């Protein structure tokens, strides 16, 4: 993949990630003045995850790093715009949730209950379930670590 193709794919990924970020921000009753920032933060998070995955990191670690970036930027923006960090960050990480792997794991579980046990279905179920669980864990831990670091009152040493 050339540089131009990568930049076009990155721009497409970031634009498409902004749409669900704004949608979920509207569901969570985020103030109208903060919707554009939720879209931008969702784009930054999903774009940084794509850059990290393209550079060779797996999806779990890329998601962890991207959610830490989203958490850090959200804390800074919350100081600038006098809002809670969750106003910006929660809707911004929703586009990174593992919908496909969770759906595939659920379909495999339904097939196992209908057709009975088979090793390929069980492997598919476990692989996708563990991937989805790891991504959700990376999102939640990565989003909470910047708050633990930046709001710490005691010295680190």
Swiss-Prot record:
Transmembrane segment boundaries: 8-28, 50-70, 87-107, 129-149
InterPro entries membership: ThrE_2, ThrE_Dicarb/AminoAcid_Exp, YjjB
Subcellular localization(s) per the UniProt record: Cell inner membrane
Keywords: Cell inner membrane, Cell membrane, Membrane, Transmembrane, Transmembrane helix, Transport
An individual GO BP term: response to peptide
Major localisation: membrane
Bilayer topology annotation: Multi-pass membrane protein
GO cellular component: plasma membrane
Disruption phenotype: Deletion of yjjPB decreases succinate production in E.coli by 70% under anaerobic conditions.
Functional note: Involved in succinate export with YjjP. Both proteins are required for export. Contributes to succinate production under both aerobic and anaerobic conditions.
Family: Belongs to the ThrE exporter (TC 2.A.79) family.
Other facts: YjjPB constitutes a split-type ThrE family transporter.
Subunit-level organization: The transporter is composed of YjjB and YjjP.
Protein name: Probable succinate transporter subunit YjjB
Species the sequence originates in: Escherichia coli (strain K12)
UniProt gene name: yjjB
């Amino acid at each position: 993949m050339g540089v131009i193709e990568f930049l076009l794919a990155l721009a497409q990924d970031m634009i498409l990630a902004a749409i669900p970020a704004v949608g979920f921000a509207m569901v969570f009753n985020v103030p109208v003045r903060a919707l554009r920032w939720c879209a931008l933060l969702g784009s930054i998070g999903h774009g940084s995850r794509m850059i990290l995955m393209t550079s060779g990191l797996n999806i779990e670690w890329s998601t962890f790093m991207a959610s830490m970036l989203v958490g850090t930027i959200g804390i800074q923006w919350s100081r600038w715009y006098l809002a809670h960090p969750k106003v910006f960050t929660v809707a911004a990480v929703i586009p990174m949730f593992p919908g496909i792997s969770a759906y595939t794991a659920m379909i495999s579980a339904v097939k196992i209950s209908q057709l009975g046990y088979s090793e390929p279905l069980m492997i598919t179920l476990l692989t996708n379930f563990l991937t989805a669980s790891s991504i959700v864990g990376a999102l939640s831990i990565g989003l909470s670590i910047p708050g633990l670091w930046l709001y710490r009152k005691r010295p680190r040493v």
